[in-house]
Amino acid sequence: MVDESPSLMGQPVAFKDIVDVAGVSTTCGTEVNVGRTPVKDAPVVQRLTAKGALPVAKANLQEFSYGILGDASAYGRVINPRDPEICGGGSSSGSAALVACGALQLTVGSDSAGSVRVPAACQGCLLYTSPSPRDRG
């Protein structure tokens, strides 16, 4: 018998708090955006939920995704679960921390200047980034 359920059926996923999830506040790590609640999912959320993934959390980030340390957010510094003395990296530090501490197996960050690569390296996480720009976002 062939399992025809979506490939990510029931897989919990967190999204960096710069990614819009309908009905959930998107703050971009700043108090300026408190109360900004999108009515539509971002394309990456649409694609993953169509495959059965379950959005369960928004991940903290460097304010406005601007920085590589993960230490500047209205919601506090992201602590590296592997070693609190080492920076969590940024800007997708919260996404990496959720994987590094074992809370989730799948999170979504964003990367323009190392924003996913740096926290993955700092926190010892496996990183996948699509080779195709059309698959991003």
Mark where each language-model region is.
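Short, hinge-like loop/turn segments at secondary-structure boundaries
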Residues: 73-76, 123-127
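Single conserved hydrophobic/aromatic residue that forms the stacking wall/gate
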Residues: 131-137
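Gly/Ser-rich catalytic/binding loops embedded in alpha/beta enzyme cores
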Residues: 1-113
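Selective for proline/serine-rich intrinsically disordered segments
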Residues: 10, 117, 129-131
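Structural signal for conserved beta-strand scaffold positions within catalytic alpha/beta enzyme cores
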Residues: 57, 127-129
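Structural signature of FAD isoalloxazine-binding scaffolds in flavoprotein oxidoreductases
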Residues: 117-123
